[in-house]
Amino acid sequence: MRKFILLFIILIAAGSSSAQKLHFNVKGLSDTTIFLAKYLGPKLYYADTVLSKNGSLEFDGSKHPRGLYAVVIPGVKYFEFVHDNEDVDMTVGDVNDMVGSMKVDKSKNNKSFYEYILFMTEMKKKSQKMNQEYTKLSGDAKDKKLEEIRAVGKEIMSGQMEIYKANKDLFIGTMVRMSMDVDLPEPPKDKDGNITDSNFVYNYYIEHFWDDIPLKDDAIVRTPVYHNKLDKFFSQQGLIQIPDTITKYAKKLVDQMDYGNEDNQVFQYTVHHITQKYESSKIMGMDRVFVFMADNWYCGDNNHAWWMSEENSTKLCERADKIRNTMIGEYSPMLILPDSTEEKWINSYKVEADYTVLYFWDPNCGHCKKTTPKLQVLYDKKFKERNIEIFSVGKATGSDFEDWKKYIKENELTFINVGLTQSVYNQAMEDPRPLLQKTTLQSLNYTDTYDIYSTPRIFILDKDKKIKFKQLSIGQLEEILDDLTGHHDDVKLYPKEDPENGATDPDDDHGDHDGHDH
């Protein structure tokens, strides 16, 4: 008897797990192919197809993981629904107004989902109208309208909280909770009404940003909501944009995820998103975040990136190692290279200056030909008298050697000019050991040491040869060194606004690439 009851329970459980019919009726729809699309972050990907008949169509929900989905009909129209391992039965009354005509016949998630959509649509219209009115007002009327706008904001948060609390055990509840902003309390004040902690609001916002978000539930990455929340947290709307702050909270966030468990989708999505964001960031110094992510979740004993091939993982770690050499705040790798006579070897660390401009260039690079003469003008008119030196490393192998020497002479470059000359290069290729009495391997391999895959590249080093700034345009270089040396108000010889003095970022189209892999 006990065996029979146990078997009966198992059969019921098996039946309930397979009974996930996703059924839809679309009035007026011709018999055609219909697509099921699933979200991964903000993007939709095709997941299944069925043929509709008399406007009726059905997918097998047991084949698809929980998340937010879309039914795509011809004419590139679609409507969304929540899949949370329950039967779904929905009817679209008008293909030209699918949200407004939607009737949810079966599915607790989707009844609340469409109530939420209609609520937010109404609130958005109300808010937009008030904002338009606000821009046309002034004085007391403007202040009053601002209070009304804030009241609408509170109404939105109140409505969201009501829907969330009513659906805590459903996935729609999770989606709504992720959409909500942090409800900020008033900061502490003294008896005179003065705020006693100016950082209270920011700290509270950051510390409570992820409250009630199930970071071990893979379904959250199959909505655009988690992606948007993640993006906001790591933007200026969230964290202070300082590398050490970002790495601190990246680790705090990821450590809440079960990354020892392979196939953890939230961990994969989060780590990949943060890593990619800061690897490609054009904000100076943010490459430190990329290196931090590589060290903590991709490389060596910390390699938890189960989704990456060994080859791609190795490439990422090699990239991190290259960047590591030139991170802002680190000591610059020492360079000892010969001048154009090939007789005098100059050590970058023996350059006595308050600031050193480290400049990598190529005599045949178009952008370098514009930048280098400007650098000489700055050296003559500003840098020399302020104890700022330029340590210039030119491309001097092969035919570039004569071009390099010719360019130095014709343009009367009086700052330090060194390069890896052809004879030194040949000797290094044959047997570098004799050269190591004069120089170092990192000097002979300076393009790898400093990750020079395009030119020109400009760094600013302090008196201790620590990297303070990098990837600068000529206009940025002038402005920064004016500021650092107390000449903020000096007339700019090369204003940043002039496109000719634009960025030398290696990811833009100005720099000339030398064939090194990214």
Where are the language model's segments positioned?
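N-terminal "domain-start" segment that seeds a small globular fold
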Residues: 309-348, 423, 480-482, 486-489, ...
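Structural microenvironment flanking redox-active thiols in thiol-disulfide oxidoreductases
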Residues: 370-411, 419-429, 442-445
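Short active-site neighborhood of thiol/selenol oxidoreductases, capturing the structured segment around
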Residues: 345-375, 389-391
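A non-transmembrane, solvent-exposed segment enriched in polar/low-complexity residues
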Residues: 20-168, 175-212
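Long amphipathic alpha-helical scaffold segments
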Residues: 271-280, 286-337
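Thiol/disulfide oxidoreductase modules built on the thioredoxin-like
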Residues: 179, 427-483
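Structural micro-motif
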Residues: 66-68, 413-416, 450-459
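Bacterial Sec-dependent N-terminal signal peptides
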Residues: 1-25, 470, 488, 516-518
